[in-house]
Structure formats: C-alpha cells, structure tokens
Amino acid sequence: MGVTIVLGSQWGDEGKGKITDMLAQQATLCCRAAGGHNAGHTIVHGDKTYDFHILPSGLVSPSCVNLIGAGTVVHVPSFFKELASLEDKGLEGAGKRIFISDRAHVCFDLHSVVDGLEEAKLGGRKVGTTGKGIGPCYSDKAARRGVRVGEILDEALFERKLRSLDAGYRARFGELEYNVEEELARFKEYRKRLGPYIVDQLAFLQKYKDAPNTLVEGANALMLDLDHGTYPFVTSSSTGLGGAVQALSLNPTSISSIIGVVKAYTTRVGSGPFPSEQLNDAGDKLQGVGKEFGVTTGRRRRCGWFDMVLCRYSQAINHYTALNLTKLDVLDDFDEIKVGVAYILPDGTRTENTMPADPEVLEKVQVEYVTLPGWKSNTMGVKKYEDLPANARAYIEYIERGLGGVPVKWIGTGPARDHMICRE
C-alpha cells in the first residue's frame, strides 16, 4: 500500500478538496481519518459544485472506494443528506462506494444542543465552534460513554446508551430542547439503512493492503489540532499526521507522501489568536476577493498575511514532503504582499519557528514582516509555472526557502478543478 496523506497546514479552509479530488482520480481508496460534519470543503467539477462535510471527496471519482474512519464522529442524518445531495447532482452509485468504520462514534442532535449550551456558558471567551456537537461527542468518547456506529445495529444496547447520555446531560443542564424518544424512533429507520455501510475497519483495510494508491483526506488543519493547535481554540480531534496514522492503523513505512495544503495568505474562522490578522483594508480585500465564508457555517473568515512562523511550526509537526499552495490568484491585485517571518514575544524574545502554547501570549506577539512586490496581473486559470508573473514565482520560491526547501508542487490559480499548476 502506497499512502498519500493530505493535511491542512493552517486553521482549515485551505482548499484541501481540490488536491484530494485530483489525487483521488488515481486512488483505489480514499479515507477520512478525523472530524465530523463540522468540516467543509467544495469541489467544482465541470458545471457542478459539490459541498463535502463528512463524506470523503474521493466519491467524485467513480473508481474510488471511500471510508469514514475510526477517528471520526458521524451525524447520521447529515451522512444520508449529504449522500443524497451528491447522488442528486449526478454521482450515481456513490452509495455503493462509501463505508463507515464500526468504531467511529455517533454524533447526535443531543450533542449539538449541548454544544450551544456550553458555548453560551463561556460568554466572551467562547471557542467559536460550528455548533455541530463535535466537541461534546468527542468528550463522550474520551469519557468512555460514547456510542459507536457499530452499536447502532444492537437496538437494546443503543437505546440503553443513548438514554444514559440523555439522562446525564439533563442532570447537568436541566431541561433540554431535545426529545430522546423522537431520536430513538428516527434511529429505528436509520438502523435498517445503515447496515450495508458499516464495516470492521481493520478487515476492510486489509483487503486494500496491496492497493497501489491509498489517499487519506485530512479534515480541519494542524492549528486546530487538540494537542498542537491554539488550544483551547481548537477542534476536538487530532487533525495532524499522528491522528491519521492512529485513526486508520497506518503502517508509517507505507506513507509515500505527506502533502501540506497552505493558502497563499491566512484565514481563520471563529475565536482565538491570529497573529497575522489584518483588521484593515488589506484584510477586507482578502476576504472579499477570496470569498472567505465558511462552507459549514457561512461565517465570515478572518483574514491576514501568510504566516511563515505558523507554517514552519506546522511543518515540524506534520513533516510535509510537498506543499499545495492555494488561492494564489486572490493576491493578483495587491501592490505589495507581506509575509510574517518572526514573532516578537511580550518579553522581547524573537522566534521564527515556534508557537507559544499560551493563547494569551500568542495574542500579544508582534509580527515581523517582510514586504514583497505584488505582480498586478491576472493569474486565474494559469496552468504552467513559467507562465506566472515573475513576482508571483518569486513569492512562491520565497515561501519554499522559508520552509526549509519543502517544494511547492501544486499551485491553485482559481476555483475550477483544472485551475492548478503541477510542478514536476
């Protein structure tokens, strides 16, 4: 098995879907390792646009089998709704190429209700979650009271565990806008439909151990990782390389490439420190030109310049063998483009490659910038590296040097599927 892993390098929304879609054309198997329907990315295929949340984007390739792995949390209504939407848009037979690990956990509507209550309690220090219930679901998993997908098939066990969850949250919060009887009734119907999708993950993966191309699709991004991200302003799963290996029982020696997807500038959704954020005309321009609204929530993304410190930190943890730089065309009309190359910490210390663990310290860092000349010409749809303006190439090569020579192998130059430069 030759494994390619695609990971987000910043705070998500880097555009992982397009490179995953491209690589899936040659893949036998595409796997999601972590996260749930809080993730979101868009693939433009011909005249159709597909929005993905919990389903692997390998479904766009008619020859690719897809797995939702053990590290994920699955909101069953969203699974069926998303699958139906894809099939309605012409992806016939998608339902025959998607499987769910029996060890993945179930994200209930109950978790979404609890998510909102927990955020409200935090007041001004709220995390800024998607409100999808992901955090409470992973909390139940860690506390060993969660419900696994495979347990849906055992009606008595499933009912006992869901009632226990409901009772526990009512003891904590009082009355909830949630009806456990209605949920149990819904799952009577889901139980009949889910059976063909649920698999023993290890046995399933063993069937593909000799597959030449297996693709692992990361969700969210390294800076949202539970351990390595800007905690507590993170998601509740392991979104980096380690999480992919753990969730899918990967043999590390089978990994042939680790692709870091990095936007040509930086964005973030929700609360938390963002050193290179631009609360000015430059930030507004990045937001407007880049159409920076979340696929899952529709929220306006915060925007800032490319942060080399953040990306060096991300590289040190995820060990990228190549990069996909996305949305280069968004920078086309800037006279000057800034790159954050160092942080000055509150105590005066200068750092180029580490992120303070304390979010309050990170919020107070001063960013040292290098200013590069813009190219002031249209790059949308450019497909050959040599056809890019000289200053655009200089920008890309500056990023490569700043990240220790990790090659920028792919460059996104627009939203369409073929708006991609591949540098061999």
Swiss-Prot record:
InterPro entries with a match to the protein in the record: Adenylosuccin_syn_GTP-bd, Adenylosuccin_syn_Lys_AS, Adenylosuccinate_synth_dom1, Adenylosuccinate_synth_dom2, Adenylosuccinate_synth_dom3, Adenylosuccinate_synthetase, P-loop_NTPase
EC code: 6.3.4.4
Residues forming the catalytic site: 13 (proton acceptor), 41 (proton donor)
GO annotation, biological process: 'de novo' AMP biosynthetic process; cellular response to cadmium ion; IMP metabolic process
Any Pfam family hit: Adenylsucc_synt
Residues that, per the record, bind substrate: 295-301
Highest taxon in the source lineage: Eukaryota
Location of the protein in the cell: Cytoplasm
Gene3D superfamilies: Adenylosuccinate Synthetase, subunit A, domain 1, Adenylosuccinate Synthetase, subunit A, domain 2, Adenylosuccinate Synthetase, subunit A, domain 3
Pathway this chain belongs to: Purine metabolism; AMP biosynthesis via de novo pathway; AMP from IMP: step 1/2
UniProt GO molecular function: adenylosuccinate synthase activity; AMP binding; GMP binding; GTP binding; magnesium ion binding
Residues the entry annotates as binding IMP: 13-16, 38-41, 130, 144, 220, 235, 299
Residues annotated as binding Mg(2+): 13, 40
Catalyzed reactions per annotation: IMP + L-aspartate + GTP = N(6)-(1,2-dicarboxyethyl)-AMP + GDP + phosphate + 2 H(+)
Essential cofactor(s): Mg(2+)
Top-level EC class: ligase
Keywords from the named record: Cytoplasm, GTP-binding, Ligase, Magnesium, Metal-binding, Nucleotide-binding, Purine biosynthesis
One CC-aspect GO term: cytoplasm
Binding site for GTP: 12-18, 40-42, 301, 327-329, 412-414
Cofactor annotation remark: Binds 1 Mg(2+) ion per subunit.
Similarity comment: family membership: Belongs to the adenylosuccinate synthetase family.
HAMAP family attached to this UniProt entry: Adenylosucc_synth
Protein function: Plays an important role in the de novo pathway and in the salvage pathway of purine nucleotide biosynthesis. Catalyzes the first committed step in the biosynthesis of AMP from IMP.
Protein name: Adenylosuccinate synthetase
Organism: Aspergillus niger (strain ATCC MYA-4892 / CBS 513.88 / FGSC A1513)
Organismal lineage: Eukaryota, Fungi, Dikarya, Ascomycota, Pezizomycotina
